[in-house]
């Protein structure tokens, strides 16, 4: 009789431990997801979503660019003088505003998140019409399309293109990993970025 009681007690204990294990696993998964969403935020979502939609870009790409280039700091100035969330140079901004869109805006507007995101997205769109792969688009955005064109002349096809600059190559890899992370965090479970 005693062994039956122990058997029932052991079975009950195992079931309780399994339930606790499942709950802890679920809670851990939720905590990890929350931490990852903190690390990979969706700040400026209204502007990013609107511009991505307007320029037919995947918003995850725009979030990844902002995350990797400025870490969502609209006042960020890089060592080479690029400004704002999407790290545009004054020269690129003036070329976009004057020659591409005919708007003739002051470069001081690069600090404005809405303006910076809009022109960063437009520049990405421009580069997607010029190049066939996102790796090449990122390389051109990070360096200069003229330099990337030169690199491409040294490669038989764009599909075989290997970025010869190690720093640019590493940054493009990092951006693509961040794009993948945003897609995983904000799209997998129907939680689309908006």
Question: What are the residue ranges of the model-derived segments?
Answer:
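Hydrophobic membrane-insertion alpha-helices, especially the h-region
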Residues: 10-29
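Catalytic glycan-binding domains that act on GlcNAc-containing polysaccharides
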Residues: 27-194
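N-terminal Lys/Arg-rich, disordered targeting/topogenic segments
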Residues: 1-8
């Amino acid at each position: 009789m005693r062994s039956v009681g122990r058997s029932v007690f052991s079975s009950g204990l195992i079931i309780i431990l399994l339930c606790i294990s499942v709950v802890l696993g679920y809670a851990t998964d939720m905590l990890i997801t929350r931490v990852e969403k903190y690390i990979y935020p969706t700040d400026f979502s209204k502007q990013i979503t609107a511009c991505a939609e307007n320029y037919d870009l995947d918003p995850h790409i725009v979030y990844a660019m902002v995350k990797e280039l400025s870490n969502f700091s609209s006042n960020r100035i890089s060592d080479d003088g690029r400004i704002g969330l999407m790290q545009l140079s004054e020269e690129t901004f003036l070329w976009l505003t004057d020659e591409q869109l005919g708007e003739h805006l002051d470069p001081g507007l690069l600090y404005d998140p809405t303006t910076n995101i809009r022109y960063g997205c437009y520049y990405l769109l421009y580069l997607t019409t010029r190049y066939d792969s996102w790796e090449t688009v990122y390389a051109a955005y990070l360096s200069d399309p003229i330099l990337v064109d030169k690199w491409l002349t040294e490669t038989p096809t764009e599909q075989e293109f290997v970025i010869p600059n190690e720093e640019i190559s590493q940054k493009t890899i990092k951006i693509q990993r961040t794009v993948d992370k945003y897609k995983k965090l904000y799209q997998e479970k129907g939680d689309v970025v908006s």
